[in-house]
From Swiss-Prot:
It is found in: Cytoplasm. The active site is at 114, 250, 280. The gene is fabH. The last Arg residue of the ACP-binding site is essential for the weak association between ACP/AcpP and FabH. InterPro entries: ACP_syn_III_C, ACP_syn_III_N, FabH, Thiolase-like. The lineage of its organism: Bacteria, Pseudomonadati, Pseudomonadota, Alphaproteobacteria, Rhodobacterales. It comes from Cereibacter sphaeroides (strain ATCC 17023 / DSM 158 / JCM 6121 / CCUG 31486 / LMG 2827 / NBRC 12203 / NCIMB 8253 / ATH 2.4.1.). This is Beta-ketoacyl-[acyl-carrier-protein] synthase III.
Amino acid sequence: MTIRAVVRGVGHYLPDRVVPNSELEAIVETTDEWIRTRSGIERRHFAAEGQTTSDLAARAARAALEDAGLQPDDIDTLIVATSTADLTFPSAATMVQAALGMTRGFAFDVQAVCAGFVYALANADALIRSGQAQRVLVIGAETFSRLMDWNDRATCVLFGDGAGAVVLEGTESAGTSADRGILATDLHSDGRFKDLLYVDGGSSTGTTGHLRMQGREVFRHAVEKLAETAHTALEKAGLGAGDVDWIVPHQANLRIISATAQRMQVPMDRVILTVQDHGNTSAASIPLALSVGKARGQIKEGDLLVTEAIGGGLAWGSVVLRW
């Protein structure tokens, strides 16, 4: 028998404030048409003043626990994927642990920017397979609205805030690709491309930084690397693109998503899309899409999913799982 990390529950949380493209027209030189044409984004959510990343994460976590029928102390390990933790330290994960009232297990953050949730899933899968954890709560949460340079129309219109969470549980299986759970993971990074997407301050610099991005170069790397890592993960699982029920991509922008799907030879009607409503929520985008996809009735038990993401670093990767 094989131990598989099976999804037992999902949940998400979006801040109350919805910011349509029309609102950004008053802040920066842009138009609704310009934003939609280049990104597919129509609106995004912004956290309220005083609302932190860990606040969003805790709300999503509670929703996922409820969906799984579990209590906080049923969880062995809590992982938060984020680039916008409340403080330099302690970790956002320990703050969420406290907010949930967890009194057992351990918690830590994963920082791989937009690829963070994929990295966190891979970590959770390894912990479960090795027997170090039975139930892992994996959260992606971000408040990227606080990193924006509101004079840079190429970036400030793209990002939003939100959180999504998944509960994974170790379950015995026959170890076939038909069994539920995470089937394969594939992770990469290449620091040579660190200047393509970064924040120019913060942390130990003692300054306040803003997000900087070379959009054309990021697009080129994203489409190539996302399709490649997805195919690699599928090969590890003994599967191909034709077996995929849903691609659940990092919701960076519609152009990257559609170009990657085309390169993978997967039609867009098999791609979960939320970017139009959420914008780019970095590490939160995939768990948000998983939760929304389930709520819409798109993702069903037994479906084969591929999640793929790329972020600053550059860091990228994919996970193949049977829902």
